Amino acid sequence: MSARPPLRAAVVGAGRMGMVHGHLLQVHPETELVGFVDRDTSLAEHLASQGLRAPLYPSVAALYAAAPPDAVFVCTPTHTHLAVVRECLARRVHLFVEKPLATSRADAEAILRLATDAGVTHAAGYVYAHLPVVQAAHDLVAAGALGELLRFTAHAYVSEVFGPKKGWFFQKEQAGGGVVANMASHVLFILGWYFGAIRRLVASTRSHFSTVDDSAQVLFTFANGVTGLLDTSWSVPGTQMLDYGLAVDGRNGTLVLRRERILLHLLAPAAGHDAGWSEIHASDLPADTAFDVSPHIGGEAFYRQLQSFVDACRTGVLPFCSLAEACNTQRMIEAIYASAAAGAPVDA
């Protein structure tokens, strides 16, 4: 148990992701869940039935008057993020915003400016980047194990959409898009974290069942010269959990990242690894997670994400998943949709 006072945190938005973050904040030894905010106050009974003990307030102002937090987690529909962030920053609170950051690059950059001007710690909810295997693969790439980076292939698939869908999540104006904005953005964040800013891309999207994009193919050129292809769909049968992967080629070898392991082939020894094939399994990596909310889907990443945010709030040093990095992801999302609409490459 930490000797430091807990980070007092509130959750704005009492939907699915709001409840996920609420549970984490309630049980983490360094945080205290002080309240939820949602205009639908009838949700209080549902929250209580799920074991969430914090009170529900009808507005941010009501929360601040009754139980002022140190940090706020924004888990409302994407199109509301900018307005909610502006309201939350009426007082100085640290800021966590669920992904995607906004429905447009302009709104995402406005959110970043608000947080920067307020001088608060900030982070975005790209949780898969917190998986130990994803972080270990990043460290190998950053350490130069592969030598000069050349190209990559990536994918993100899940079995979710096989017919008409209703709700804000499937309305482009409210969700910002379909599979690209709301699922593949996890992989886009990882690509940006590994390779930096993009220079140009060309994309195609298709709507098979819903009114938003259900699949997409994207060819990237990054500013550092790395090129690669992303294929994604949430209409792939037989994939109940998100299946993501990344293969990176460099002049000194190849790295293949999957959910539970890294396969590494080096032409010459580098970064503490011998030449030839080696495997790094998730179980080989340091276990620094106090709890795992859902082991079968890599739930340890949620704990690590929260711990990263708490540490950043304590130290004032922004985490790698800051809103600035999320804006890089938003630039990719917007460029993908622009290219698909134009049927032509887009400079980003």
Can you say where each PLM-predicted feature lies in the sequence?
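N-terminal Rossmann-like dinucleotide-binding module
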Residues: 1-51
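C-terminal capping/lid region of NAD(P)-dependent oxidoreductase domains
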Residues: 4, 120, 147-150, 338-348
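Beta-loop-alpha module in the N-terminal Rossmann-like domain of NAD(P)-dependent dehydrogenases
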Residues: 21, 54-114, 301
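Hydrophobic residues in well-ordered beta-strands that form the structural core
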Residues: 97, 122-124, 257
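Rossmann-fold dehydrogenase core element
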Residues: 109-128, 147-152
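C-terminal glycine/acidic-rich active-site capping loop/insertion
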Residues: 127, 222, 245-247, 251-324, ...
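Contiguous beta-strand/loop segments that form the cofactor/metal-binding neighborhood of enzyme cores
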Residues: 189-265, 303-316
